[in-house]
């Protein structure tokens, strides 16, 4: 077991709790019901995948895409419209997450989508949405991506959007803005968008429907499209960009043609079959629309497959439909496997073992080894060995998913996975950034000055190291280090990074799950696997913080608004408990040696009291950011496998 230099194992003040024996029947019964439900959700091929729901921008954009292309499925459009109307807030706006404040950009897109779908603008829900948008300064105040959509639908002039010429594709690597300097999701979204914006492509919009009523000033006369640019660097870049845009008419046609060819070749190489460009909805739509402008007919393989990749994201119910931003089978299968491994740790169940074997074999088959990948630009000498987040995304293995999957394979204790584990260890260790942490898809993606450019008003252009991803990498690599002797420096650097990232209140920030509870869980499970003593000051501060934020009903909950207001008194707090957050807090506290604490007992009781009749839990609220402050997610599996994991660990701690 790897030992940290700050190990206080000789400290006499710490004593491991002695578990008392109480009636375990309710816990055992809850575990059985939750396990049985999960086993029924497994697909024949061995994987699990649950719905991944975003805010209303994605389904609204699906309707907008249909009208952009003049490929309108009226029945589907009607079902999506039902979904959109059902999510309107009482004040007429639309929020980025359940219970959140209204968001101008989201509300503009939904209003436009519903108008395209045939809703009367004088209907009460449309009037309320319009009045709310106008009260916020109108559609001119929406974000860059919304204004680009409005420009393509000819609702605002092109000067309302940043100057993003396709000639960016020809810039040298040393240039301050280069494609390789931004995150994978930015690359895949931007490259086809360069083509669309440089050529000022407009929507077919067969009914010629507009939304001029959403502007307080005539869009042609509006002079305040970039009020969000406030930093000196941002204003400097905006000035340079506005100046450069005046020369666009004089750019040589051959240069534009060369850049367009390079951009189209770049994204066509990464179309990724029926899983789509980057396997994310915004990139897929941009690619689909760019292929149309480039002249590919509807029957062409690229167009056909690009459309299918988008359609595969739809969730169609009897009375409504929505579009997912992506799908999460590898992530869901990896985490479900870890939960079921905890269930089967000491009490072998043949059905569970068979399900685990099938799941792990499916995961092993999805490992990306010698595939091309953008990550190789920063780490050309590292051996491939990661996993994507989606079914297929060969250019973009996900470090976080890879750590979870590799850890599950390692715990599977099956020699058939030895080579997969070896490759995963080499790849994850090789993807460590210089500061000791890990980003999600790239190493050393820390060009923070780029977040000041006008295009980056979303603040999500980059993929820097984060505590949650780093905690899971530590979890896997520390376990692997029990078999390998070449990971000591990697682990020491990771611990140094995570200690530095701890907040003064004892928590850690959660980039990919909400929020400080998620981040703290991520790090504490890594610390536990790394062999840190339970009396380590960092662990004690984290445990004390988790105890301090427990709700009166025994559970835990955290508001997504902590990404907007991260002040200490808001962290780890919400007006209600959630099974997801309760489970994470319990797993974190047990990793900190608190299995016998009254706080853990109360949390377990909360889970027992709130389990549904089918064996799972039903959280109402979103549980992760796609991009903090901009885009949020609800993983529908989180209230199914995390509570099972927590209950199983509690049972195992008390018996062993």
Question: Where are the regions that the model predicts?
Answer:
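Preference for long, amphipathic alpha-helical scaffolds in soluble/luminal domains
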Residues: 1-656
């Amino acid at each position: 077991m790897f030992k940290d230099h700050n190990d206080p194992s000789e400290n006499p003040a710490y004593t491991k709790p002695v578990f008392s024996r109480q009636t375990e029947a309710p816990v055992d019964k809850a575990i059985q019901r939750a396990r049985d439900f999960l086993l029924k959700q497994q697909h024949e091929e061995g994987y699990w995948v649950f719905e991944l729901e975003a805010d209303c921008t994605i389904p609204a954009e699906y309707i907008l895409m249909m009208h952009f292309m003049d490929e309108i499925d009226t029945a589907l459009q009607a079902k999506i419209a039902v979904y959109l109307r059902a999510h309107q807030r009482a004040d007429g706006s639309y929020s980025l997450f359940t219970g959140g404040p209204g968001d101008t950009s989201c509300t503009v897109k939904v209003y436009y989508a519903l108008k395209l779908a045939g809703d009367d603008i004088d209907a009460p829900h449309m009037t309320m949405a319009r009045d709310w948008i106008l009260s916020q300064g109108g559609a001119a105040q929406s974000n860059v991506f919304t204004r680009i959509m409005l420009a393509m639908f000819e609702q605002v002039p092109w000067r309302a959007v940043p100057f993003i010429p396709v000639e960016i594709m020809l810039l040298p690597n040393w240039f301050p803005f280069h494609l390789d300097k931004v995150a994978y999701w930015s690359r895949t979204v931007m490259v086809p968008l360069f083509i669309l914006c440089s050529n000022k492509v407009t929507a077919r919009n067969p009914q010629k429907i507009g939304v001029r009523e959403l502007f307080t000033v005539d869009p042609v006369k509006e002079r305040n499209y970039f009020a969000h640019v406030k930093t000196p660097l941002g204003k400097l870049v905006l000035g340079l960009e506005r100046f450069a845009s005046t020369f666009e008419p004089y750019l040589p046609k051959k240069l534009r043609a060369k850049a367009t060819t390079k951009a189209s070749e770049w994204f066509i190489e990464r179309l990724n079959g029926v899983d789509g460009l980057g396997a994310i909805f915004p990139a897929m739509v941009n690619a689909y629309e760019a292929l149309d402008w480039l002249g590919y007919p509807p029957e062409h393989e690229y167009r056909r497959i690009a459309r299918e990749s988008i359609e595969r994201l739809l969730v169609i119910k009897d009375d409504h439909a929505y579009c997912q931003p992506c799908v999460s089978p590898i992530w869901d299968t990896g985490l479900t496997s870890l939960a079921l491994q905890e269930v089967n740790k000491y009490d072998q169940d043949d059905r569970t073992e068979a399900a685990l074997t099938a799941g792990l074999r499916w995961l092993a088959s999805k490992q990306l080894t010698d595939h091309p990948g953008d990550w190789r630009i920063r780490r050309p000498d590292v051996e491939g060995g990661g996993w994507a987040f989606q079914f297929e995304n060969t250019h973009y293995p996900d470090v976080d998913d890879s750590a979870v999957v590799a850890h599950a394979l390692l715990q599977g204790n099956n020699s058939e996975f030895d080579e997969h584990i070896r490759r995963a260890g080499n790849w994850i260790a090789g993807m460590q950034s210089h500061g000791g942490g890990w980003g999600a898809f790239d190493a050393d993606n820390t060009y923070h000055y780029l977040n000041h450019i006008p295009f980056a008003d979303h603040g999500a252009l980059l993929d820097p190291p984060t505590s949650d991803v780093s905690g899971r990498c530590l979890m896997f690599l520390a376990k692997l280090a029990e078999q390998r002797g070449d990971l000591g420096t990697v682990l020491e650097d990771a611990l140094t990074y995570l200690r530095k990232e701890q907040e003064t209140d004892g928590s850690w920030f959660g980039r990919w799950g909400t929020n400080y509870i998620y981040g703290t869980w991520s790090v504490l499970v890594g610390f536990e696997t790394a062999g840190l003593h339970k009396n380590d000051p960092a662990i004690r501060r984290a445990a004390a913080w988790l105890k301090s934020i427990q709700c009166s009903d025994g559970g835990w909950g955290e508001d997504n608004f902590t990404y907007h207001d991260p002040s200490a008194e808001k962290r780890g707090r919400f007006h209600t408990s959630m099974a997801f957050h309760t489970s994470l807090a319990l797993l974190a506290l047990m990793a900190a040696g608190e299995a016998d604490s009254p706080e853990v007992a109360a949390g377990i009781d909360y889970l027992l009291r709130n389990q549904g009749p089918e064996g799972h839990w039903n959280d109402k609220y979103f549980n992760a950011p796609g991009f903090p402050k901009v885009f949020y997610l609800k993983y529908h599996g989180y209230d199914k496998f995390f509570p099972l994991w927590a209950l199983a660990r509690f049972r195992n701690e008390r018996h062993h």
